[in-house]
From Swiss-Prot:
Compositionally skewed regions (Polar residues) per UniProt: 134-146
Record-annotated disulphide pairs: none
Domain SH3: 160-219
Molecular function terms, GO-annotated: guanyl-nucleotide exchange factor activity
Gene3D superfamilies: Calponin-like domain, Dbl homology (DH) domain, L1 transposable element, trimerization domain, Pleckstrin-homology domain (PH domain)/Phosphotyrosine-binding domain (PTB), SH3 Domains
Protein name, UniProt field: Rho guanine nucleotide exchange factor 6
The DH domain, residue ranges: 241-421
Organism: Rattus norvegicus (Rat)
Length: 772
């Protein structure tokens, strides 16, 4: 590592120089531009020697300001007895090597001072160095348990001794506490457990991943860690500033809790007794502000108790993690209500401003109330910054270090959830308060409260085109809206009733992440793609809760009293229900199972006797008449039909007529017996056993007769109706386009006629003037 890179790493590790977002191609030029104004140097000397620089220009605008900052740094370096450079050497960049030599000397001088104190990390580094120089001292073999313990021990050390692994395969999380990784990702392991699962951090997120999906990175392959560079150890400085940062957290937390309590006592509670707002409006304005105040006071007390223990036993991160469920419930509820509170502030701004100023607030009083109600959001953002600063000044071996990292991640996640929830509730309020274009039916406010709302991408029916929609879920209906072309409002696109809705997850199919479909008897198939997994899980939970609610209980009974008793007995039992099963329909016993196949057409059964008598009468005249009245049978009986056609003798037809008479008598007797039991046993229609003859004409003009069940026929008719609807929709679109084109053409013709008329008039007037 060259001197420039060493200095850059050192400054970043001390926190006085911001880490560049991109890879540094030329460290020397980067240093020149970063150190030129002297601000970084003043921060450095203040960090190394607190109190050496009392005041410096943090935003220098002129050359004189920059030179003054550099001189302040050089004065501080005089106490370290190192060779210094001239201010112009740095500002002009002409002799930058002297600047590097001074910085390296400062690093060496502070290292010598720090080396006089014991440091666990330095001893671990020296032990590692000695083991590398003497490989014979290494243990030749270890058991898997010992290796796991060694890896866990490595993670308690600092710098390059932290276990770092590289993903060999892609892994997709299936639970909330797991970590999704891609091949080649670098993961910092935070916990090693037996059983094949390790805990690690990737891109600021901590979770579990399978250990056989990764491989350990060799020391030569590991990325450079600023804390791991020998000679840049700042443990005593870290220890000194840890207490300062912790005290800052306590002070700001007390001040924040005090401000909330002051707002509640001085303004909000007196406002409740005032007549400026109704009870509903005041409830919207206040929300759960009182609960937030109480919770923040509890948090202050808990943090103070943590700070009273010895420094190596501080559990600030653990305390915050224990209270994180309360954080989420309090702040998410506050965020959900905040857009309604802002709406109340907007509607009654004049009255509230007068009230605030009468209570002693400075003008404009409404601004004090608005900013005070927004402080919980600003404080939530500060938690992340404060904890990051605390972690920066905390030793990696501190028992609270891992909890601090987890708390940072938890607060980042909570902050993102709160921001999304505020935007969603604000959009929801906008939809409910503004008119919706092409809305059908009663006002949307009559549907009740919105259970959930989000922006999705949907596919309707068999169409592959994806459309952006806003879904609003109410207790009885799902509303679909779209943004207007100019993004000035919302347009109504349809609704789906909850009754009869069937929701199916599609996320298990590859390529359909965060996807589900909606089907039903009254709606065409809708495929919905959610923007993230959180929205997807929320939609699944809410829709399943509404569609799979308590089922109604009914049973066939002869009297209404038995039906009522059955219903009451069902509702009184609180036992858990099993899986839904189709109703058990008791089929009545009948002689119809011994009958031959019923008539293939319903119309044939109506005039059966008349037709049979007519057939018998005409059969003696011509065999063609018999063939005319007999319907075509099933395909597998084609041979018998051909044989029947061949038989043309009158004797054979008479024999068949006698057989038909026997069948008729049998059916008549069976129907009579069945009729005697009609009052006692209900008749049940079984669609799958009903048959129909369907005549279809193909494109080549050939007519085909097919036998279909009633169910198949209904579904075929449903498909035909669907096709007709689509064709009708296309025809409407074509008609609208044609009407629009005709109107445009009419406008164009009128315009041309008008221009022609004007030109003719102009010519005639010019001719008249010439003649005169």
């Amino acid at each position: 590592m060259n001197p420039e890179e060493r200095v850059v790493t050192w400054l970043i590790s001390l926190g006085v120089l911001e880490s560049p977002k991109k890879t540094i191609c030329d460290p020397e030029e980067f240093l020149k531009s970063s150190l030129k104004n002297g601000v970084v140097l003043c921060k450095l000397i203040s960090r190394l020697l607190p109190g050496s620089v009392e005041k410096y220009c943090q935003e220098p605008q002129t050359e004189a300001d920059c030179i003054d900052n550099i001189n302040d740094f050089l004065k501080g370096c005089a106490t370290l007895q190192v060779e210094v450079f001239e201010p112009d050497d740095l500002y002009s960049g002409a002799n930058f090597s002297k600047v590097l030599n001074t910085l390296l000397a400062v690093n060496k001088a502070t290292e010598d001072q720090l080396s006089e104190r014991p440091c666990g990390r330095s001893s671990s580094l020296s032990a590692t160095t000695s083991s590398q120089t003497n490989p014979q001292a290494a243990v030749p073999s270890t058991t898997p348990e010992q290796q796991s313990e060694e890896k866990a021990a490595e993670m308690t050390e600092n710098g390059s001794h932290q276990l770092i692994v590289k993903a060999r395969f892609n892994f997709k999380q299936t639970n909330e506490d797991e970590l999704s990784v891609c091949k080649g990702d670098i993961i910092y392991v935070t916990r090693v457990e037996e059983g094949g699962w390790w805990e690690g951090t990737l891109n600021g997120r901590t979770g579990w991943f399978p250990s056989n999906y990764v491989r350990e990175i060799k020391p030569s392959e590991r990325p450079l860690s600023p804390k791991a560079v020998k000679g840049f150890d700042t443990a005593p400085l870290t220890k000194n500033y840890y207490t300062v940062v912790l005290q800052n957290i306590l002070d700001t937390e007390k001040e924040y809790a005090k401000e909330l309590q002051s707002l509640l006592v001085t303004y909000l509670r007196p406002l409740q007794s005032n007549n400026n707002l109704s009870t509903v409006e005041f409830t919207c304005l206040l929300g759960n502000f009182e609960e937030v105040c109480t919770f923040q006071q509890t948090l202050c007390q808990a943090l103070e108790e943590c700070s009273k223990s010895p420094e190596n036993q501080h559990k600030v991160g653990g305390c915050l993690l224990n209270l994180m469920p309360h954080f989420k419930s309090m702040y998410l509820a506050y965020c959900a209500n905040h857009p309604s509170a802002v709406n109340v502030l907007t509607q009654h701004s004049d009255d509230l401003e007068r009230f605030m100023e009468n209570q002693g607030a400075s003008s404009p009083g409404i601004l004090i109330l608005t900013t005070s109600l927004s402080k919980p959001f600003m404080r939530l953002e500060k938690y992340v910054t404060l904890l990051q600063e605390l972690e920066r000044h905390m030793e990696d071996t501190h028992p609270d270090h891992q909890d601090i990292l987890k708390a940072i991640i938890a607060f980042k996640s909570l902050m993102g959830q709160c921001q999304d929830l505020r935007k969603r509730k604000q959009l929801e309020l906008q939809i409910l308060s503004e008119p919706i274009q092409a809305w059908e039916g009663d006002d949307i406010k009559t549907l009740g409260n919105v259970i959930f709302m989000s922006q999705v991408v949907m596919q309707h029916g068999a169409c592959e085109e994806k459309e952006e929609r806003y879904f609003l879920l109410f207790s009885s209906v799902l509303i679909m809206l779209s943004a207007s072309p100019r993004m000035s409002g919302f347009m109504y696109q349809g609704k789906v009733p909850i009754a009869g809705m069937v929701v199916t997850r599609l996320d298990e199919i590859e390529g359909n992440d965060c996807t589900f479909e909606i089907t039903g008897s009254t709606v065409e198939r809708i495929v919905v793609h959610c923007n993230n997994n959180q929205d997807f899980q929320e939609w699944m939970e809410q829709l399943n809760r509404l569609t799979k609610g308590p089922a109604s209980c009914s049973s066939l009974s002869k009297t209404s009293s038995s039906s009522c008793s059955t219903h009451s007995s069902f509702s009184s039992t609180g036992q858990p229900r099993g899986p839904l099963e189709p109703p058990q329909i008791i089929k009545p016993w009948s002689l119809s199972c011994l009958r031959p196949a019923p008539p293939l057409r319903p119309s044939a059964a109506l005039g059966y006797k008349e037709r049979m008598s007519y057939i018998l009468k005409e059969s003696s005249k011509s065999p063609k008449t018999m063939k005319k009245f007999l319907h075509k049978r099933k395909t597998e009986r084609k041979t018998s039909e051909e044989e029947y056609v061949i038989r043309k003798s009158t004797a054979a037809l008479e024999e068949d007529a006698q057989i038909l008479k026997v069948i008729e008598a049998y059916c008549t007797s069976a129907s009579f017996q069945q009729g005697t039991r009609k009052d006692s046993v209900p008749q049940v229609l079984l669609p799958e056993e009903e048959k129909l003859i369907i005549e279809e004409t193909r494109s080549n003009g050939q007519t085909i007769i097919e036998e279909k069940s009633l169910v198949d026929t209904v579904y075929a008719l449903k498909d035909e109706v669907k096709e007709l609807k689509q064709e009708n929709k296309k025809m409407k679109q074509c008609l609208e386009e044609e009407l629009k084109s005709r109107k445009d053409l009419e406008k164009l013709v009128r315009k041309l006629l008008k221009q022609t008329d004007e030109s003719i008039r102009a010519e005639s007037s010019s001719k008249t003037s010439i003649l005169q």
